[in-house]
């Protein structure tokens, strides 16, 4: 069944293959273009450096008019990531635009890693450490980086 969402996702996939953004990758799971596996590499010169963080993206038939659900599969200690792995990111909610594609979503998440929004935290502990005890925050992040290699 060919829908506009599926056609758009195939275009997104083609772009990820031909012009991949640095430090991110994604592709549909076998036999289901509506579910994607993705990987974000922790940005250099950040506490997340060298981390390999796995995510899953779920698209509905309303895509690109409705944002996908995005969730970290890898453990993540970050002010804007819930314990469930779900993200609190404005472009996946009230600031969504149909012009965003998979590459834009993943690069936004990658940028969020080192530039969290502490005014609206999903993980209060991570947010408080980020603001008040950066050394401990970095230690906890580095622990998740090491765990990401085992996932």
UniProtKB/Swiss-Prot annotation:
Keywords: ATP-binding, Chromatin regulator, Cytoplasm, DNA damage, DNA repair, Nucleotide-binding, Nucleus, Sporulation, Transcription, Transcription regulation, Transferase, Ubl conjugation pathway. The active site is at residue 88. It catalyses: S-ubiquitinyl-[E1 ubiquitin-activating enzyme]-L-cysteine + [E2 ubiquitin-conjugating enzyme]-L-cysteine = [E1 ubiquitin-activating enzyme]-L-cysteine + S-ubiquitinyl-[E2 ubiquitin-conjugating enzyme]-L-cysteine. InterPro entries: Ub_conjugating_enzyme, UBQ-conjugat_E2_core, UBQ-conjugating_AS, UBQ-conjugating_enzyme/RWD. Signal peptide: none annotated. It comes from the Eukaryota. PROSITE patterns: UBC_1 (PS00183), UBC_2 (PS50127). GO terms for molecular function: ATP binding; proteasome binding; single-stranded DNA binding; single-stranded DNA helicase activity; ubiquitin conjugating enzyme activity. Catalyzes the covalent attachment of ubiquitin to other proteins. Plays a role in transcription regulation by catalyzing the monoubiquitination of histone H2B to form H2BK123ub1. H2BK123ub1 gives a specific tag for epigenetic transcriptional activation and is also a prerequisite for H3K4me and H3K79me formation. Also involved in postreplication repair of UV-damaged DNA, in N-end rule-dependent protein degradation and in sporulation. Belongs to the ubiquitin-conjugating enzyme family. This is Ubiquitin-conjugating enzyme E2 2. It comes from Aspergillus fumigatus (strain ATCC MYA-4609 / CBS 101355 / FGSC A1100 / Af293). The lineage of its organism: Eukaryota, Fungi, Dikarya, Ascomycota, Pezizomycotina.
